[in-house]
Amino acid sequence: GVVTLLTVLFNWHRETTFVPLGVLWLTALLGGADDLLNIFYGKERHPRTLGRIARLIRIHRDVKLRIWYLISFPWQAYKRLFYLLGSHPGRGVQAHEKIIIQLIIGGIIAWWLSFKLDWTELWVPWLGHVDLGVLMAPVIIFLVVFLANAVNITDGIDGLSAGTLIISYGAFFAIALKQQSSDISLLTATVIGALCGYILFNIKPAKYQMGDVASLGMGVLLTAIAFALDRPILLPIIGAVFIIEIMSVILQTTSKVFLGRRLLRMAPLHHHLEITGKGETSIVMYAWAFSAIFAIIGIWLSFQ
Protein backbone atom coordinates (compact mmCIF):
# COMPACT_ATOMS: atom_id res chain seq x y z
CA GLY A 1 0.00 0.00 0.00
CA VAL A 2 2.79 2.43 0.90
CA VAL A 3 4.65 1.63 -2.33
CA THR A 4 1.53 2.22 -4.41
CA LEU A 5 0.56 5.46 -2.65
CA LEU A 6 4.00 7.06 -2.92
CA THR A 7 4.44 5.94 -6.53
CA VAL A 8 1.05 7.29 -7.58
CA LEU A 9 1.67 10.61 -5.82
CA PHE A 10 5.28 11.25 -6.80
CA ASN A 11 6.41 8.80 -9.49
CA TRP A 12 3.48 8.11 -11.81
CA HIS A 13 4.76 7.35 -15.30
CA ARG A 14 2.18 5.40 -17.27
CA GLU A 15 4.69 3.74 -19.57
CA THR A 16 7.11 2.47 -16.92
CA THR A 17 5.36 2.27 -13.52
CA PHE A 18 1.71 1.54 -14.34
CA VAL A 19 2.14 -2.13 -15.30
CA PRO A 20 4.65 -3.05 -12.52
CA LEU A 21 2.27 -1.64 -9.91
CA GLY A 22 -0.69 -3.33 -11.57
CA VAL A 23 0.89 -6.79 -11.54
CA LEU A 24 2.10 -6.20 -7.98
CA TRP A 25 -1.50 -5.66 -6.91
CA LEU A 26 -2.84 -8.58 -8.94
CA THR A 27 -0.31 -10.92 -7.36
CA ALA A 28 -0.95 -9.49 -3.89
CA LEU A 29 -4.68 -10.10 -4.37
CA LEU A 30 -3.92 -13.72 -5.29
CA GLY A 31 -1.87 -14.14 -2.13
CA GLY A 32 -4.50 -12.34 -0.05
CA ALA A 33 -7.26 -14.60 -1.36
CA ASP A 34 -5.19 -17.65 -0.47
CA ASP A 35 -4.49 -16.38 3.06
CA LEU A 36 -8.13 -15.45 3.70
CA LEU A 37 -9.43 -18.78 2.45
CA ASN A 38 -6.92 -20.65 4.59
CA ILE A 39 -7.84 -18.69 7.71
CA PHE A 40 -11.57 -18.08 7.47
CA TYR A 41 -13.58 -19.46 4.61
CA GLY A 42 -11.96 -22.35 2.82
CA LYS A 43 -13.14 -25.93 3.02
CA GLU A 44 -10.95 -28.99 2.81
CA ARG A 45 -11.09 -30.46 -0.68
CA HIS A 46 -11.39 -34.16 -1.42
CA PRO A 47 -10.83 -34.58 -5.17
CA ARG A 48 -11.88 -37.72 -6.99
CA THR A 49 -9.22 -39.95 -8.47
CA LEU A 50 -8.79 -40.01 -12.25
CA GLY A 51 -9.89 -43.63 -12.26
CA ARG A 52 -13.11 -42.71 -10.47
CA ILE A 53 -13.79 -39.88 -12.95
CA ALA A 54 -13.13 -42.17 -15.92
CA ARG A 55 -15.59 -44.69 -14.48
CA LEU A 56 -18.25 -42.00 -14.00
CA ILE A 57 -17.81 -40.95 -17.65
CA ARG A 58 -18.76 -44.49 -18.68
CA ILE A 59 -21.55 -45.41 -16.25
CA HIS A 60 -23.17 -42.26 -14.81
CA ARG A 61 -26.91 -42.15 -15.49
CA ASP A 62 -27.01 -38.41 -16.15
CA VAL A 63 -25.78 -37.81 -19.71
CA LYS A 64 -25.08 -34.13 -19.00
CA LEU A 65 -22.82 -35.02 -16.08
CA ARG A 66 -21.05 -37.64 -18.19
CA ILE A 67 -20.34 -34.96 -20.80
CA TRP A 68 -19.16 -32.57 -18.07
CA TYR A 69 -16.80 -35.17 -16.59
CA LEU A 70 -15.42 -35.86 -20.06
CA ILE A 71 -14.87 -32.16 -20.85
CA SER A 72 -13.26 -31.48 -17.46
CA PHE A 73 -11.04 -34.58 -17.51
CA PRO A 74 -7.92 -32.69 -18.81
CA TRP A 75 -8.33 -30.17 -15.97
CA GLN A 76 -8.61 -33.00 -13.44
CA ALA A 77 -5.48 -34.61 -14.91
CA TYR A 78 -3.69 -31.25 -14.62
CA LYS A 79 -4.64 -31.07 -10.93
CA ARG A 80 -3.53 -34.63 -10.26
CA LEU A 81 -0.12 -33.83 -11.76
CA PHE A 82 0.41 -31.20 -9.06
CA TYR A 83 -0.76 -33.62 -6.36
CA LEU A 84 1.75 -36.16 -7.68
CA LEU A 85 4.50 -33.55 -7.38
CA GLY A 86 3.69 -32.90 -3.73
CA SER A 87 0.84 -30.37 -3.69
CA HIS A 88 -2.01 -31.33 -1.38
CA PRO A 89 -5.69 -30.35 -1.50
CA GLY A 90 -6.22 -27.68 1.12
CA ARG A 91 -8.56 -24.86 1.99
CA GLY A 92 -6.93 -22.02 0.10
CA VAL A 93 -6.05 -21.36 -3.52
CA GLN A 94 -4.45 -24.55 -4.82
CA ALA A 95 -0.99 -24.73 -6.42
CA HIS A 96 -2.42 -25.56 -9.85
CA GLU A 97 -4.79 -22.57 -9.59
CA LYS A 98 -1.99 -20.24 -8.49
CA ILE A 99 0.12 -21.23 -11.47
CA ILE A 100 -2.70 -20.41 -13.90
CA ILE A 101 -3.16 -16.94 -12.35
CA GLN A 102 0.60 -16.34 -12.29
CA LEU A 103 0.80 -17.30 -15.96
CA ILE A 104 -1.86 -14.68 -16.71
CA ILE A 105 0.10 -12.07 -14.73
CA GLY A 106 3.27 -13.09 -16.58
CA GLY A 107 1.34 -12.71 -19.83
CA ILE A 108 0.43 -9.14 -18.88
CA ILE A 109 4.10 -8.28 -18.31
CA ALA A 110 5.03 -10.03 -21.57
CA TRP A 111 2.41 -7.97 -23.42
CA TRP A 112 3.71 -4.78 -21.78
CA LEU A 113 7.33 -5.45 -22.72
CA SER A 114 7.02 -7.30 -26.03
CA PHE A 115 4.16 -5.41 -27.62
CA LYS A 116 3.70 -2.14 -25.74
CA LEU A 117 7.42 -1.33 -25.43
CA ASP A 118 8.42 -3.46 -28.46
CA TRP A 119 11.19 -5.34 -26.65
CA THR A 120 12.37 -8.57 -28.27
CA GLU A 121 16.05 -8.44 -27.32
CA LEU A 122 17.72 -9.89 -24.23
CA TRP A 123 20.87 -8.20 -22.93
CA VAL A 124 23.75 -10.58 -22.13
CA PRO A 125 27.04 -9.49 -20.46
CA TRP A 126 29.91 -9.05 -22.94
CA LEU A 127 27.67 -10.09 -25.86
CA GLY A 128 25.28 -7.16 -25.91
CA HIS A 129 21.70 -7.67 -27.07
CA VAL A 130 20.48 -11.00 -28.45
CA ASP A 131 17.25 -10.91 -30.44
CA LEU A 132 14.86 -13.58 -29.13
CA GLY A 133 11.93 -12.60 -31.33
CA VAL A 134 8.76 -14.48 -30.40
CA LEU A 135 10.64 -16.40 -27.70
CA MET A 136 10.84 -13.24 -25.58
CA ALA A 137 7.27 -13.60 -24.29
CA PRO A 138 7.72 -17.19 -22.98
CA VAL A 139 10.99 -16.17 -21.30
CA ILE A 140 9.22 -13.29 -19.54
CA ILE A 141 6.33 -15.48 -18.39
CA PHE A 142 8.67 -18.20 -17.11
CA LEU A 143 10.80 -15.75 -15.09
CA VAL A 144 7.74 -14.06 -13.58
CA VAL A 145 6.26 -17.36 -12.37
CA PHE A 146 9.64 -18.74 -11.27
CA LEU A 147 10.69 -15.67 -9.24
CA ALA A 148 7.27 -15.17 -7.66
CA ASN A 149 7.34 -18.70 -6.27
CA ALA A 150 11.03 -18.52 -5.40
CA VAL A 151 10.49 -15.50 -3.14
CA ASN A 152 7.37 -17.11 -1.69
CA ILE A 153 9.28 -20.28 -0.79
CA THR A 154 12.10 -18.27 0.79
CA ASP A 155 9.63 -16.63 3.19
CA GLY A 156 9.99 -19.32 5.85
CA ILE A 157 12.27 -17.88 8.54
CA ASP A 158 11.98 -14.54 10.32
CA GLY A 159 13.83 -11.89 8.31
CA LEU A 160 15.10 -14.23 5.58
CA SER A 161 13.06 -13.11 2.57
CA ALA A 162 12.76 -9.46 3.66
CA GLY A 163 16.51 -9.02 4.07
CA THR A 164 17.39 -10.72 0.80
CA LEU A 165 14.71 -8.70 -1.00
CA ILE A 166 16.21 -5.45 0.32
CA ILE A 167 19.61 -6.49 -1.03
CA SER A 168 18.20 -7.59 -4.41
CA TYR A 169 16.14 -4.43 -4.85
CA GLY A 170 19.19 -2.44 -3.72
CA ALA A 171 21.23 -3.96 -6.55
CA PHE A 172 18.63 -2.99 -9.14
CA PHE A 173 18.41 0.47 -7.54
CA ALA A 174 22.14 0.91 -8.16
CA ILE A 175 21.70 -0.26 -11.76
CA ALA A 176 18.77 2.13 -12.27
CA LEU A 177 20.85 5.04 -10.95
CA LYS A 178 23.71 4.17 -13.29
CA GLN A 179 21.27 4.04 -16.22
CA GLN A 180 19.75 7.35 -15.08
CA SER A 181 16.31 5.75 -15.01
CA SER A 182 14.71 8.10 -12.49
CA ASP A 183 11.26 6.49 -12.47
CA ILE A 184 12.55 2.94 -11.86
CA SER A 185 15.13 4.13 -9.32
CA LEU A 186 12.39 5.94 -7.38
CA LEU A 187 10.16 2.86 -7.54
CA THR A 188 12.91 0.57 -6.23
CA ALA A 189 13.84 3.10 -3.53
CA THR A 190 10.20 3.16 -2.40
CA VAL A 191 10.12 -0.64 -2.19
CA ILE A 192 13.40 -0.69 -0.25
CA GLY A 193 12.07 1.89 2.20
CA ALA A 194 8.88 -0.12 2.75
CA LEU A 195 10.87 -3.34 3.26
CA CYS A 196 13.25 -1.63 5.71
CA GLY A 197 10.27 -0.51 7.76
CA TYR A 198 8.76 -3.99 7.61
CA ILE A 199 11.92 -5.89 8.54
CA LEU A 200 12.10 -4.09 11.89
CA PHE A 201 9.01 -6.09 12.85
CA ASN A 202 9.98 -9.26 10.98
CA ILE A 203 13.37 -10.12 12.45
CA LYS A 204 13.29 -12.78 15.17
CA PRO A 205 10.96 -12.88 17.03
CA ALA A 206 8.72 -11.67 14.20
CA LYS A 207 5.62 -9.65 15.03
CA TYR A 208 4.39 -9.66 11.44
CA GLN A 209 4.74 -12.16 8.61
CA MET A 210 5.02 -11.38 4.91
CA GLY A 211 2.72 -14.17 3.76
CA ASP A 212 1.61 -14.81 0.19
CA VAL A 213 0.23 -11.26 -0.14
CA ALA A 214 3.66 -9.65 -0.12
CA SER A 215 6.07 -12.45 -1.06
CA LEU A 216 4.40 -13.29 -4.38
CA GLY A 217 4.01 -9.59 -5.22
CA MET A 218 7.61 -8.77 -4.35
CA GLY A 219 8.87 -11.56 -6.60
CA VAL A 220 6.77 -10.41 -9.54
CA LEU A 221 7.73 -6.76 -9.07
CA LEU A 222 11.43 -7.65 -8.84
CA THR A 223 11.14 -9.45 -12.18
CA ALA A 224 9.25 -6.55 -13.78
CA ILE A 225 11.92 -4.09 -12.61
CA ALA A 226 14.70 -6.30 -13.97
CA PHE A 227 13.02 -6.30 -17.38
CA ALA A 228 12.34 -2.56 -17.22
CA LEU A 229 16.09 -2.05 -16.73
CA ASP A 230 16.92 -4.53 -19.52
CA ARG A 231 18.79 -6.74 -17.04
CA PRO A 232 16.62 -9.88 -16.48
CA ILE A 233 19.63 -12.09 -17.22
CA LEU A 234 21.01 -10.96 -13.84
CA LEU A 235 18.03 -12.23 -11.83
CA PRO A 236 19.62 -15.64 -11.10
CA ILE A 237 22.70 -13.83 -9.75
CA ILE A 238 21.18 -10.91 -7.87
CA GLY A 239 18.41 -13.20 -6.63
CA ALA A 240 20.75 -16.16 -6.01
CA VAL A 241 19.27 -17.02 -2.60
CA PHE A 242 15.76 -17.24 -4.06
CA ILE A 243 17.00 -19.44 -6.91
CA ILE A 244 18.81 -21.80 -4.53
CA GLU A 245 15.72 -22.07 -2.33
CA ILE A 246 13.31 -22.95 -5.13
CA MET A 247 15.81 -25.31 -6.77
CA SER A 248 16.14 -27.18 -3.47
CA VAL A 249 12.38 -27.77 -3.55
CA ILE A 250 12.41 -28.82 -7.22
CA LEU A 251 15.31 -31.24 -6.71
CA GLN A 252 13.76 -32.64 -3.53
CA THR A 253 10.44 -33.26 -5.27
CA THR A 254 12.10 -34.76 -8.35
CA SER A 255 14.18 -37.10 -6.20
CA LYS A 256 11.16 -38.25 -4.18
CA VAL A 257 9.01 -38.89 -7.27
CA PHE A 258 11.59 -40.58 -9.51
CA LEU A 259 14.18 -42.01 -7.10
CA GLY A 260 12.00 -42.64 -4.05
CA ARG A 261 14.31 -40.85 -1.62
CA ARG A 262 14.98 -37.36 -0.28
CA LEU A 263 18.05 -35.30 -1.07
CA LEU A 264 17.48 -33.05 1.95
CA ARG A 265 15.99 -33.82 5.33
CA MET A 266 13.39 -31.16 4.57
CA ALA A 267 12.87 -28.66 1.75
CA PRO A 268 13.37 -25.78 1.14
CA LEU A 269 17.03 -25.52 2.08
CA HIS A 270 16.56 -23.22 5.10
CA HIS A 271 14.42 -25.89 6.83
CA HIS A 272 17.07 -28.53 6.10
CA LEU A 273 19.68 -26.30 7.75
CA GLU A 274 17.39 -25.80 10.76
CA ILE A 275 16.94 -29.55 11.20
CA THR A 276 20.70 -30.15 10.97
CA GLY A 277 21.24 -27.82 13.93
CA LYS A 278 21.85 -24.37 12.43
CA GLY A 279 20.14 -21.55 14.30
CA GLU A 280 17.61 -19.28 12.58
CA THR A 281 19.71 -16.18 13.12
CA SER A 282 22.82 -17.82 11.66
CA ILE A 283 20.92 -19.03 8.59
CA VAL A 284 19.51 -15.55 7.98
CA MET A 285 22.87 -13.81 8.46
CA TYR A 286 24.65 -16.20 6.08
CA ALA A 287 21.85 -15.79 3.50
CA TRP A 288 22.11 -12.00 3.70
CA ALA A 289 25.90 -12.12 3.29
CA PHE A 290 25.64 -14.58 0.39
CA SER A 291 22.98 -12.40 -1.24
CA ALA A 292 25.10 -9.26 -0.83
CA ILE A 293 28.12 -10.90 -2.48
CA PHE A 294 26.09 -11.98 -5.49
CA ALA A 295 24.32 -8.62 -5.67
CA ILE A 296 27.70 -6.92 -6.00
CA ILE A 297 28.67 -9.40 -8.72
CA GLY A 298 25.38 -8.67 -10.49
CA ILE A 299 25.96 -4.91 -10.34
CA TRP A 300 29.45 -5.37 -11.77
CA LEU A 301 28.16 -7.61 -14.57
CA SER A 302 25.44 -5.10 -15.46
CA PHE A 303 28.09 -2.66 -16.71
CA GLN A 304 30.02 -5.17 -18.82
Predicted regions and their residues:
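"…together with the soluble PPM/PP2C metallo-phosphatase catalytic core" -> "…together
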Residues: 1-209, 213-243
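Membrane-proximal soluble regions of multi-pass membrane proteins
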Residues: 51-80, 240-286
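Loop-to-transmembrane boundary segments
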Residues: 91-101, 276-287
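Membrane-embedded alpha-helical transmembrane segments of multi-pass integral membrane proteins
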Residues: 168-171, 248, 294
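Alpha-helix boundary/capping detector
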Residues: 222, 248, 252, 298-300
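Final/C-terminal transmembrane alpha-helix of multipass membrane proteins
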Residues: 280-301
